[in-house]
Structures are given as C-alpha cells and as structure tokens.
C-alpha cells in the first residue's frame, strides 16, 4: 500500500507547503498570501499543517499564469470564481441534455 496521491484522488491534500511551492515554482509565503486572500483553501491536518492537493497545485499554476499576465489578486479571485461558475453551468447543461435525451428515448 502507498501513502502517495492516487491518480483519481485529486482533491486529497498530500503535499506540504514547501513541496507544493517547489512543484509550482512559487515561494511558500506566496501560497500563504493566496490562501489569506481566499484564492485557495488547502486541506489541514488535525495539527493545522497545510496539505495541498493536485487540484490545489493546478489552481496555483493558474494563479501564477494570471499574475504573470499582469492580473492583480482581486482580478484573479474574480476570474477563478467565473471559471468555477462556468464549469458548474457546463456540467449542469450536460446533465440537463442527458435527461432530455433520456426522456425522449423513453417516450412511446
């Protein structure tokens, strides 16, 4: 059995702040700043240690790209919220289309 991240478990926090920072090419204090600004919310151990997931790392990479493009933290927060809302609405659209297709197939 392994304690490492499982490929399908991208929400599970497994990386400490130093490793996460190194993996995404940012400084650990930057990760703390982004958390304090509400840009991400890593898991915490019972002792309070931050644990970053694969999804957190992807989000940090997106934050870094937006910063490199000149977007400030307030703008990044707005962009990330809009992306999440877009993903939610897209998933809802797929679900509704599937339901509509199922309803059409079940008609006599």
Task: Identify the meaning behind each predicted range.
Residues 1-65:
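Basic helix-turn-helix/winged-helix DNA-binding cores
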């Amino acid at each position: 059995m392994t304690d490492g991240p499982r490929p399908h478990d991208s929400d599970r926090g497994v990386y400490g702040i130093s490793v996460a920072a190194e993996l995404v090419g940012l400084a650990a204090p930057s990760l703390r700043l982004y958390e304090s600004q509400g840009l991400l919310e890593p898991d915490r151990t019972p002792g309070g240690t931050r644990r970053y997931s694969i999804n957190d790392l992807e989000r940090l990479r997106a934050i870094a790209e937006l910063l490199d493009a000149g977007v400030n933290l307030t703008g990044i927060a707005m962009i990330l919220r809009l992306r999440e809302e877009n993903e939610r609405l897209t998933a809802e659209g797929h679900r509704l289309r599937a339901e509509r297709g199922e309803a059409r197939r079940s008609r006599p």
